[in-house]
């Protein structure tokens, strides 16, 4: 609310006037209405007026959390790409992509503060063998799987194979916590034996439990964040395509950093506010809420146009 704002003004004279239809002397206890710019002028000791100064408070007028998007003119050639995944890493956005008519995975990047200028698509050194959908950032490295082998990079250009990693088919989620890093930080994957495996340093891996029925393995996205009630514990949530072809809901599973098992979040009976099954669905965590969006889908018997809406949840 900027209709009643108390301000502090420093000048060589106590005679500061508020310019309006009828000028008035400003005092430090005045609350001023800054819904419109306010003008001041100073009366010097010589009793002469100086220049008129204008003060304005910039107010964010967009409705908060409305997720209004604006189109950025850029040299990103999206029409040449048939599949892609974006990853945030080291203040940059990396897009791992497969060009139309090709199988090779390439990467392009832009600064998080830019979005207009993108680097040219650079094929990964093992691009024809890589799975773009497994690209993930964890700690100070990027990761991707190629022919069941795990690779890492510090810059998206130079990659090295992690020889000690088991044969993997997908990366699931990770925690990179600032609150309790020694206990919470972990990278979770699924190996070729359909078992969960995890690492706390990228080199030493531990096999956990088998992947349960119904766990999503297609169009997988994840978020991790500290609990509001206990910041030393992190929650991981995974969202993906429902493996049941006739089901119209997306699948959500979760795990706490203090656990080593996953639990699902099935839609409650007669609850119509479920997350619909969308093609290539993705999930983000923003401002203590979850947001999901994706391609074409269906909900409550109606067809959903691709990328026509965000679906939000607090739990």
Stretches with model-predicted labels:
Residues 274-311:
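Loop/turn-rich, solvent-exposed surfaces of beta-rich toroidal or solenoidal domains
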Residues 99-111, 146-158, 183-204, 233-257, ...:
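Structural motif
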Residues 72-104:
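Beta-strand-rich domains and repeat architectures in extracellular enzymes and scaffolds
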Residues 76-88, 123-140, 164-185, 210-232, ...:
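Repeated scaffold domains used in trafficking and secretory/extracellular systems
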Residues 1-83, 115-127, 158-160:
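Beta-rich interaction/scaffold domains
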Residues 65-74, 116-126, 160-168, 206-214, ...:
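Beta-propeller fold detector
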Residues 92-94, 141-143, 185-186, 235-237, ...:
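Conserved core beta-strand positions within WD40 beta-propeller blades
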Residues 96, 100-167:
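Structured core of small recognition/catalytic domains
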